[in-house]
Swiss-Prot record:
It holds the Pfam family Ribosomal_L30. Belongs to the universal ribosomal protein uL30 family. This is Large ribosomal subunit protein uL30. CDD domains: Ribosomal_L30. InterPro entries: Ribo_uL30_ferredoxin-like_sf, Ribosomal_uL30_bac-type, Ribosomal_uL30_ferredoxin-like. Disulfide bonds: none annotated.
């Protein structure tokens, strides 16, 4: 299964509560932080919800 490198490129201070919770559930805390996640439909759905603050690359 492929992996995704997810980077938080914008601040989460202006996001609503559910979007902030989604970013936290992805494992991101501060602007500029990166995580690697499995490429699953659940992760893709979370990315789509907050795609305007993320950068995503396939590994």
């Amino acid at each position: 299964m492929a992996k995704l490198k997810i980077t938080l490129v914008r601040s989460i201070s202006k996001l609503n509560e559910s979007q902030t919770a989604t970013v936290r559930a992805l494992g991101l805390r501060k602007r500029g932080s990166c995580v690697e996640q499995q490429d699953t439909p659940q992760i893709r759905g979370m990315i789509k919800k907050v795609e305007h603050v993320l950068s995503v690359e396939e590994i």
